[in-house]
A protein has these predicted regions:
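Conserved redox-active cysteine motifs that mediate thiol-disulfide chemistry
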Residues: 1-3
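Short, conserved sequence motifs used for protein processing/export or organelle targeting and
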Residues: 9-122
């Protein structure tokens, strides 16, 4: 997985949740239980690992399959842009703000935007 994510750095951003199975003492799970439980319930995760791309679950987890799916989704333009602003005034502080800009009139009525701040090496 890391190989293909390196190839798509700056275009594809992984969000990895650590669940309470098979090991309920996983330190990442213990630190972030409410959010992980919320995501497991939202996506209906029955087992791990599991991959969701733009929401729906994606089952064909091969390098070529992921590459094709990434390329397919990257070819679809987004109706919104997210501009982020980062300030690091001190070594122990990071301030982040976001602007969400709609480039098109949104379709649908039950729309939700979920933003995540992640730590990743890209």
């Amino acid at each position: 997985m890391d190989v293909i994510l390196e190839e798509y750095a700056g275009q594809v951003v992984p969000i990895r949740y650590h669940v309470w199975w098979p090991n309920g003492s996983d330190c990442f799970w213990l630190f972030n239980q409410p959010e992980v439980t919320d995501r497991v319930d939202y996506y209906g995760v029955p087992a791990v690992p599991q991959i969701h791309i733009d929401g729906p679950e994606y089952n064909l987890v091969t390098y070529d399959g992921l590459r094709a799916k990434f390329d397919e989704r990257l070819a679809v333009s987004s109706p919104i842009r997210i501009a982020n602003f980062v300030q690091m005034p001190y070594l122990d502080s990071v301030y982040v703000s976001f602007d969400v800009i709609a480039d098109e009139e949104p379709s649908g009525t039950d729309l939700r935007l979920r933003l995540a701040v992640t730590e990743w090496r890209h």
